[in-house]
């Protein structure tokens, strides 16, 4: 039978749309304003009450301000893309390949109405990294927290509080749909661990393919993923095959000033190494976690990860390349653009292209930085950890089905019957392919050992692992080796002594080394159904994910009638639509 997802492209209304660089960041109206956050003191937020040391998981400056946004999803064919190549099919947010920035302040309420004007596809929008404290039904994952928003005018208003601050992004969680363009940035203003003068806003880095995400999903079911056709910087770049087409992204610095730049990797396949010729970057935040500042010449940014950095405009007034490179012997991704780059332009310099290409940075080998020290500390017991069947997740690729499994099971959700609906109806009869792990105790550390196919006979791959609803701590990982070495490491009792529970790295996306292991833990303080998955689109599409069902009784007790009515109404609308198209079947994990 034809693919349901593939049906998106079978009857598009022809439209010849030209690409224009979107205006990403909309300034906030001067409502709630911090009264002590200045260029010389970014650590303060509200004098005497909230600053960089405030534990944002415990205390939030609720402002009463509602930031309202509207996102309208449409589709087009024969679309002229940012690098001058016409794409057969594309999906757009408010008419652009990159949606508007959702911009708020710490403690604001964010309300986003999503209207689905796609022709055949449902959709949901996930607010990546947003904790969704006690608002699990707003997490935007079809088959887990809700049913899809039906096409041809269906809508949903997502409402949640910005308990965290920093930088993130939103994207569709309907199959691999975000690879077709349903992506945008999130900026939540708050304190910072280092002073700066100018906030440059988000820099969205993304791989870019001329084929549709659907075509690539099918291709990767029996082949290694192809190189990306290009790499975009805030939705633009030149065409590597014809440099007269497209344009470089230009980031303007003011000489003598310190600038904050919010780097986001929204790719489906490519992990990036980022560097700037002649400049270092000072890291002040990773994902939504403020960290003690430190300086580096380059950053490894995995899919879904974010780094907020400061850049001092202390060099000669000129133009400089910002370069993206690929490490790990091709295991981190690759592109047909041999030199993906943007231009760092000093105000007052000419408009000519930089002349110094710089040198490739040291290879990060698809591994995260280890010197991320959270400003707000945590202490986690590690000495008593014992690996067991109820806390170990074994990731494997089936060589026969080409599906990914966790403990032998491939994720395959039912769009029309989300896990939350089972829980609300006091049923545990969800399908085994929902890959549900019950986490019932409150206010505990839940430890999870993730092992990446150490016994594989072929090559294992690194995976950017993302958890919804929580920041997790990274207590340890297998030794640092190149993915090309394919050295197997299995966690043993002797590894316990190497674990770090003294204010360890804390974030929501971390790289799982090939044939290695990773030990993470999260606090059970947020009831709901929370997806954990690889953020390589083809991997989660092929089943690499599971759901932690956390405190189900407390989750139900915390719901109100409006929450439940909205869930049931949306599922009713979706299930009225989906059977009417019964020749179009879900043919991947659904998320």
From Swiss-Prot:
Cofactor(s) this protein requires: Cu cation
Residues of the Plastocyanin-like domain: 66-189, 198-356, 416-551
Database matches in CDD domains: CuRO_1_MaLCC_like, CuRO_2_MaLCC_like, CuRO_3_MaLCC_like
Source organism superkingdom: Eukaryota
UniProt cofactor note: Binds 4 Cu cations per monomer.
Residues annotated as signal peptide: 1-20
Principal place of residence: secreted
Catalytic activity, EC: 1.10.3.2
Family stated for the protein in its record: Belongs to the multicopper oxidase family.
UniProt-recorded name of the protein: Laccase
Species: Cryphonectria parasitica (Chestnut blight fungus)
Gene this protein is translated from: LAC-1
């Amino acid at each position: 039978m034809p693919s349901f997802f593939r049906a998106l492209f079978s009857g598009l209304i022809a439209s010849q749309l030209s690409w224009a660089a979107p205006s990403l960041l909309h300034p906030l109206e001067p409502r709630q304003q911090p009264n002590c956050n200045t260029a010389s003191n970014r650590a303060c937020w509200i004098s005497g009450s909230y600053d960089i040391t405030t534990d944002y998981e415990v205390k939030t400056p609720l402002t009463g301000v509602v930031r309202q946004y509207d996102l309208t999803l449409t589709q087009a064919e024969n679309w002229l893309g940012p690098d001058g190549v016409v794409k057969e099919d594309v999906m757009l947010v408010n008419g652009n390949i990159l949606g508007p920035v959702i911009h708020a302040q710490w403690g604001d309420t964010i309300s986003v109405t999503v209207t689905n004007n796609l022709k055949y596809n449902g959709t949901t929008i996930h607010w990546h990294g947003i904790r969704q404290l006690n608002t699990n039904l707003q997490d935007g994952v079809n088959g887990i927290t809700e049913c899809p928003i039906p096409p041809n005018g269906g809508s949903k208003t997502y409402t949640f509080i910005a308990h965290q601050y920093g930088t993130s992004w939103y994207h569709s969680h309907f199959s691999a749909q975000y690879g077709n363009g349903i992506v945008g940035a999130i900026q939540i203003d708050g304190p910072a661990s280092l002073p700066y003068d100018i906030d440059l806003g988000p820099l969205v880095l993304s791989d870019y393919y001329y084929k549709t995400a659907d075509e690539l999903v099918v291709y990767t079911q029996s082949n290694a993923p192809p190189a990306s056709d290009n790499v975009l910087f805030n939705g633009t770049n030149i065409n590597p095959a014809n440099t007269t087409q497209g344009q470089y992204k230009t980031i303007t610095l003011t000489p003598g000033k310190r600038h904050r730049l919010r780097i986001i990797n929204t790719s489906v396949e490519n992990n990036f190494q980022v560097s700037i010729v002649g400049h270092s970057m000072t890291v002040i935040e990773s994902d939504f976690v403020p960290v003690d500042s430190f300086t580096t010449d380059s950053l490894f940014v995995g899919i879904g990860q974010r780094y907020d950095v400061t850049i001092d405009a202390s060099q000669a007034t000129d133009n400089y390349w910002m370069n993206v490179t690929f490490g790990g012997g091709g295991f981190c991704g690759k592109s047909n653009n041999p030199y993906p780059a943007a231009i760092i332009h000093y105000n007052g310099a000419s408009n000519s292209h930089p002349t110094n290409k710089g040198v490739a940075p040291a290879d990060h080998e698809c591994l995260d930085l280890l010197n991320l020290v959270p400003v707000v500390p945590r202490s986690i017991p590690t000495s008593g950890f014992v690996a067991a069947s109820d806390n170990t997740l074994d990731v494997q690729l089936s060589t026969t089905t080409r599906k990914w499994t966790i403990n032998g099971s491939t994720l395959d959700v039912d769009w029309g019957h989300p896990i939350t609906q089972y829980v609300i109806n006091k049923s545990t009869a969800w399908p085994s392919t929902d890959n549900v792990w019950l986490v019932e105790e409150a206010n505990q550390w839940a430890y999870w050992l993730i092992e990446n196919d150490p016994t594989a006979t072929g090559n294992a791959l690194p995976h950017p692992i993302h958890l919804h609803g929580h920041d997790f701590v990274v207590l340890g990982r297998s030794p640092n080796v190149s993915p090309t070495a394919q050295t197997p490491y299995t966690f043993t009792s002797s590894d316990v002594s190497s674990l770090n529970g003294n204010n360890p790295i804390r974030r929501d996306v971390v790289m799982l080394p090939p044939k290695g292991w990773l030990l993470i833990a999260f606090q059970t303080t947020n009831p709901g159904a929370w997806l954990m998955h690889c953020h390589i689109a083809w991997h989660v599409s092929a089943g690499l994910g599971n759901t932690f069902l956390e405190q189900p009784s407390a989750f139900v007790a915390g719901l109100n009638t409006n929450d439940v009515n909205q869930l049931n109404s949306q599922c009713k609308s979706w299930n009225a639509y989906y059977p009417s198209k019964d020749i179009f079947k879900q043919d991947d994990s659904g998320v």
